[in-house]
């Protein structure tokens, strides 16, 4: 039997997504509540979604989740995936963890040399030119393909990224049909209502139904993400094709795509500020679960941040585009935040214990 071409599959996905987009008219009503955030980094409740009081402590059994991250076969992605997988294996078996299986969704279309090291499923990239130079558009397309072909034992899925490091064992932060997500300060649906309304019409409800999130990190029930993923792909591509949206959202366009797609399906997220930290802006790892090292960390020898200027001491993943960072990176000088020092120590531990670290 002949295999359908990637372009045909995309057309089918887009067709079903347009139907979904036109049919979904749900308005989910939530009681108002004041924003709550615990000083010790616990639950963060936004007026958008609040977990009802009577279910906060009713969890009686484990609900394992499958970890899935999308990646390319670029060396830059490979060394990050190796570090991420190392810490997943260390944290998975510790008390408090509900981490299940692991899949690297490789959207380069062909196998690479990490297939035997990291559990991997190969999917097709978008046809050439369709991403318009925005490689992140491959992420929703990768999830669409993976969800169609994968046999996932767990009921929940954590959507993660290569530059995530698990600081401690991660429990399932979702509750039933409410996924758990990290609130990003720069995702602002209300401030961008004029643009958001192009994809989330008024008849669907208030723009505050669109959560201030991206697709990662998110822990979500697999039947929900299976419904959302085609719409996420469709909306993201429509956003990229619209010059006004593309200019306004830039590199976070696909994050808005996921947020809008979720809202179109009536899915609301429990917002967890303790889900993740991002050095150097977040200075402590206490009570946090994931380090996201997306920002460069630059300091002088006095331990002062020199962001925007290359520091006398620095750690920036972009310094290692062509190969992995060397083993035993120098630790930051005194005065640098604990989160930065912890990140470097964790990178060093992983690189010291991963065989053939320098050969990618």
From Swiss-Prot:
Any one annotated GO CC term: Golgi membrane
Keywords of this entry: Glycosyltransferase, Golgi apparatus, Membrane, Signal-anchor, Transferase, Transmembrane, Transmembrane helix
EC id: 2.4.2.58
GO molecular function, one term: hydroxyproline O-arabinosyltransferase activity
One Pfam entry name: HPAT
Reactions that this protein is recorded to catalyse: trans-4-hydroxy-L-prolyl-[protein] + UDP-beta-L-arabinofuranose = O-(beta-L-arabinofuranosyl)-trans-4-hydroxy-L-prolyl-[protein] + UDP + H(+)
Record localization: Golgi apparatus membrane
InterPro entries, per the entry: HPAT-like, HPAT/SRGT1-like
Physiological role: Glycosyltransferase involved in the O-arabinosylation of several proteins including extensins and small signaling peptides. Catalyzes the transfer of the initial L-arabinose to the hydroxyl group of Hyp residues. Probably involved in the arabinosylation of CLAVATA3/ESR-related (CLE) signaling peptides that move from root to shoot, to interact with SUNN receptor kinase signaling that regulates nodulation. Involved in long distance nodulation signaling events.
Organism per entry: Medicago truncatula (Barrel medic)
Descriptive protein name: Hydroxyproline O-arabinosyltransferase RDN2
Segments traversing the membrane: 13-33
Range of residues in the leader sequence: none
UniProt keyword annotation of Protein biosynthesis present: no
Membrane-topology descriptor: Single-pass type II membrane protein
Gene: RDN2
């Amino acid at each position: 039997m002949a295999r359908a071409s990637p372009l045909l599959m995309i057309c089918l996905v887009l067709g079903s997504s347009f139907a979904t987009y036109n049919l979904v008219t749900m308005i989910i009503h939530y009681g108002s509540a004041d924003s709550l955030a615990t000083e010790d980094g616990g639950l963060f409740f936004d007026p958008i979604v609040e977990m009802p009081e009577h279910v906060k402590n009713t969890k009686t059994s484990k609900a394992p989740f499958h970890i899935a991250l999308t990646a390319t076969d670029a060396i830059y992605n490979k060394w990050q995936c190796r570090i991420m997988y190392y810490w997943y294996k260390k944290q998975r078996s510790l008390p408090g963890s509900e981490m299940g299986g692991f899949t690297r969704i490789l959207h380069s279309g062909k196998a690479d040399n990490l297939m035997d090291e990291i559990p991997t499923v190969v999917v097709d990239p978008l046809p050439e030119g369709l991403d318009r130079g925005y490689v992140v558009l491959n992420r929703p397309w990768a999830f669409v393909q993976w969800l169609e072909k994968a046999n996932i034992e767990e009921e929940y899925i954590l959507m993660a990224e290569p530059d995530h490091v698990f600081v401690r064992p991660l429990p399932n932060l979702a509750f039933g049909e409410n996924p758990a997500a990290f609130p990003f300060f720069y995702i602002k649906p209300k401030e961008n209502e004029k643009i958001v309304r192009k994809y989330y019409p008024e008849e669907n409800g208030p723009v505050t139904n669109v959560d201030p999130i991206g697709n990662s990190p998110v822990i979500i029930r697999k039947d929900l993400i299976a419904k959302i993923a085609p719409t996420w792909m469709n909306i993201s591509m429509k956003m990229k094709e619209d010059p006004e949206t593309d200019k306004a959202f830039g590199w976070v366009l696909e994050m808005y795509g996921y947020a809008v797609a979720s809202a179109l399906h009536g899915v609301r997220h429990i917002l967890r500020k303790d889900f993740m930290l991002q050095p150097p802006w977040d200075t402590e790892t206490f009570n946090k679960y994931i380090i996201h090292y997306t920002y460069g960390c630059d300091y002088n020898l006095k331990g002062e941040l020199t962001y925007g200027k290359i520091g006398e001491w620095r750690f920036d993943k972009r310094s290692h585009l062509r190969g992995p960072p060397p083993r035993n990176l120098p630790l930051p000088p005194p005065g640098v935040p604990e989160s930065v020092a912890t990140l470097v120590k964790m990178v060093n531990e992983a690189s010291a214990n991963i065989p053939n670290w320098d050969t990618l």
